[in-house]
Amino acid sequence: MRFALTLTAFVGSVAALSITSPKKDQDVDLSEKTTIEWSSVSSDPSSFDIYLVKMNSYPPVNKLVAENVKTSEGSYTIDGVSADNGSGYQINFVSRDPQNTGILAQSQQFKVESSGSSTTSDSTSSASATGSASTSSSSTGTVSSTASASATASASATASSTLSKSASGTASKTASATGSETSGASASSTSSPTTTPNGAGSLTVPAGSLLLGLVALAL
């Protein structure tokens, strides 16, 4: 009798609701239509909810993907479920029946290879690379502009200093030359009139006396 009860329980557990797809280590693209398949017996609840789970991650994944799915259907297609790529995912069938609540069946672990996740990741990487390149270009332009402005300011300062020095030197030399020439000319002009009349006067008097003397002797 005890053996019969044990055998009956074993047969019942084997014949209970069982998920046949996805299979172990199967690659599943959840961004596209994915069909979940199962087998059932008449004693199973008439409906259940479908969850996508991943317990070996942090935080764990426990996402509701379908509600009140009829057990008698034998399959259900989900479409466009968002999930990160990776392994260790499972499908759980969860019952709401008050007489049989909890997990009814659990699939084997499979891998998620969603093209949507890959595309999003690639787009993000591309946007980051573009932003970095733009920042780098902007920084380079700023440095170039700063360097150019500094060089221009330096050149202007040098030119101003050179012109200032040249102007000062020219003015000094001009003033010195002009002053020297003016002083020389003034001195020459002043001394010549003073010296010439005196010389002429002294030469004229002796000459007159000499001529008168010669005339007197001749007579």
From Swiss-Prot:
Glycosylated sites: 85
Keyword field: Cell membrane, Glycoprotein, GPI-anchor, Lipoprotein, Membrane, Signal
Membrane topology note: Lipid-anchor; GPI-anchor
Entry's family note: Belongs to the UPF0619 family.
Lipidation (GPI-like-anchor amidated asparagine): 198
Span of the signal peptide: 1-16
Location in or out of the cell: Cell membrane
Gene Ontology CC terms: plasma membrane; side of membrane
Organism: Aspergillus fumigatus (strain ATCC MYA-4609 / CBS 101355 / FGSC A1100 / Af293) (Neosartorya fumigata)
PANTHER family: SERINE/THREONINE-RICH PROTEIN ADG2-RELATED, UPF0619 GPI-ANCHORED MEMBRANE PROTEIN C1322.10
Start and end residues of each stretch annotated as Disordered: 107-144, 160-205
Propeptide: 199-219
Biased composition (Low complexity): 114-144
Lineage, highest ranks first: Eukaryota, Fungi, Dikarya, Ascomycota, Pezizomycotina
Modification after translation (UniProt): The GPI-like anchor contains a phosphoceramide lipid group. The anchor position has not been determined.
Glycoprotein as UniProt keyword: yes
Protein name: UPF0619 GPI-anchored membrane protein AFUA_3G00880
